[in-house]
């Protein structure tokens, strides 16, 4: 198995393991929990202090090797799963000067070149959030936004970060997340 294919498998497996752990907690009758394995998250109920769980979306800058140290946004969640795919930690620069991420584009079988910096997905299960995040990264911004509009009707919500023309971050998010976000200039509901 190639290292790229192995990486895709490992990332998808992580979401599945989060779901298995969450299911085990529910079978034990635990109603309030958060399971987090390397940023793949599933939560139910509320925090001990009350209110929804709060999960950070990292700032996707090159070389950000410190998970959780640079939070761009906090999203409040309950009874769902959350996963982020991005191109800011594991990538290389190709011969044409393009950033090539570790995400494999299933249409080509090659590493994806994406104009998305990160794709955060909220879904019923972590395996779904993981898979959709990878898909959105492979699709790129315009096609990902188009697909996200369709998937929002099925309860799949997104928070995409791109780099604008001036280099500042631009965010595209599902309208259903609006109430949980601290919106700034450069934020766009899809």
Task: Please place each PLM-identified region on the residue numbering.
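Active-site-proximal beta-strand/loop segments in catalytic clefts of secreted hydrolases
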Residues: 36-37, 57-59, 85-86, 124, ...
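Single conserved position on a long alpha-helix in the C-terminal lobe of the eukaryotic protein kinase
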Residues: 47-97, 105
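Short, ordered coil/turn segments that flank beta-strands lining enzyme active or ligand-binding pockets
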Residues: 3, 95-96, 106-108, 165
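Proteins synthesized as precursors that undergo proteolytic processing into mature forms
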Residues: 37-39, 98-161
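Low-complexity, Gly/Ser/Thr/Pro-rich intrinsically disordered linker/tail segments
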Residues: 157-190
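Single conserved hydrophobic/aromatic residue that forms the stacking wall/gate
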Residues: 1-9
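Cysteine-centered nucleophilic/redox motifs
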Residues: 11-43, 140
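Short acidic, glycine/serine/threonine-rich loops at helix termini
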Residues: 44-49, 173-174
